[in-house]
Design a protein with these regions (language model features):
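Alpha-helical cap/lid subdomain in secreted, periplasmic
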Residues: 54-56, 76-128
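Charge-dense, low-complexity intrinsically disordered segments
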Residues: 10, 68, 103, 107
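Conserved beta-strand elements of the Class I
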Residues: 36-38, 62, 90
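A short beta-strand-loop structural module common to alpha/beta enzyme folds
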Residues: 58-71
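Soluble or luminal CAZymes and related metallo-dependent hydrolases
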Residues: 15-18, 70-74, 108-112
């Protein structure tokens, strides 16, 4: 692996871990049973709370997106990014970063997505 790629991967891993540490800290104060957005960069950068404020809507939506995330990373960190919040509704957008991996990327993505959905159904059966 090229040295610059290795360094970028290390930097991405540190950034991700910092976000997860911040999310875990914020989860302590989160209200259970609210709406959650989780996934990769499209979710992380989606300005849902700004839209809600602009429309005068009094809703709580938690955002636990992490730019660059793949489905295997979400599977590993579902506790901090989903289950600690005990959401009643979840919007998931993840998988685009999985598609640039070698081999059967689409097949692997579908398999991983099914695992994510199965774990949510098991742990949060009332969640939509």
């Amino acid at each position: 692996m090229d040295e610059s790629v290795r360094l970028l991967n290390q930097m991405q891993a540190r950034i991700c871990e910092n976000k997860l540490r911040r999310y875990r800290g914020m989860n302590v104060y989160a209200k259970k049973g609210e709406t959650l957005m989780v996934g990769s960069s499209l979710m992380e950068h989606f300005l849902i709370n700004e839209f809600l404020l602009a429309e005068g809507l009094d809703k709580v939506v938690y955002n636990r997106g992490v730019a660059g995330w793949r489905t295997d990373e979400l599977l590993k960190d579902m506790e901090a990014c989903i289950f600690e919040l005990e959401p009643s509704k979840i919007f998931i957008n993840i998988g685009s970063n999985d598609l640039d991996r070698p081999g059967d990327a689409l097949g692997r993505l579908i398999k991983q997505y099914r695992k994510i959905l199965r774990k949510i159904k098991e742990r949060l059966p009332g969640c939509l």
